């Protein structure tokens, strides 16, 4: 039972003031409880919208910064070093040397050539990377690199995929989705290995748009 007042038929000024103060406190408490209840109901929706925003921001960064360059007379390591220094100048990374070292470390752990293709995926996460980045490099002559299966293989295209070391799970999901393009279907692989910049961009953007649509639909269910 809540608080109650015993009053005479004719309220004194003190009794009236006590009742008013009680009613004001009760009203304020009820408003606060309603506000907290609404906030708790809305929190899952808010978190879902934040996740969608992080997904879309990652996709925008990747597509905004995408480029495909034909490289002549450079080894894979040389083109990676050049690429990282350009990304440093454009503000994507803050220390090219750190990222170059991380790429070489990843390569030493296992081959990065994708078996059954002419593609190699060089990827790294580092504190020196400020935002996700996807760039590609077409070699003017095939080069031999270790494949992911441990066997040497010839490649004509290097895919460079970078992300911050503190990437959230939404960003990692998008980066993983980009990687999945390299093992998709023969038509997609042909575009990645031989298509021009606009053709490859269209493939990547369509793939990520489809992924985003599916993600958004799943969040609304």
Question: Where in this protein do the model-derived segments appear?
Answer:
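Cytosolic covalent-transfer regions centered on His/Cys nucleophiles
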Residues: 1-221
């Amino acid at each position: 039972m809540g608080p109650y007042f015993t009053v005479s038929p004719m309220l004194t000024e003190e009794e009236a003031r006590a009742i008013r103060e009680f009613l004001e406190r009760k009203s304020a408490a009820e408003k606060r409880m309603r506000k907290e209840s609404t906030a708790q109901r809305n929190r899952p929706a808010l978190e879902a919208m934040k996740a969608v925003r992080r997904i879309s921001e990652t996709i925008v960064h990747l597509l905004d910064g995408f480029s495909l360059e034909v490289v002549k007379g450079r080894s894979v390591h040389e083109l990676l070093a050049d690429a990282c220094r350009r990304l440093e100048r454009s503000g994507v990374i803050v220390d090219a040397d750190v990222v170059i070292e991380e790429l070489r470390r990843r390569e030493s752990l296992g081959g990065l050539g994708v078996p059954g293709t002419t593609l190699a995926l060089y990827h790294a996460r580092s504190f020196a990377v400020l935002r996700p980045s996807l760039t590609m490099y077409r070699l003017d002559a095939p080069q031999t690199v270790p494949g992911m299966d441990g066997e040497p293989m010839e490649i004509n295209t290097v895919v460079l995929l970078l992300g911050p070391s503190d990437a959230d799970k939404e960003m990692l999901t998008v980066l993983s989705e980009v990687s999945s393009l390299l093992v998709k279907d023969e038509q997609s692989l042909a575009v990645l290995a031989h298509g021009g910049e606009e053709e490859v961009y269209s493939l990547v953007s369509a793939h990520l748009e489809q992924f985003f649509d599916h993600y958004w639909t799943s969040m609304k269910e």
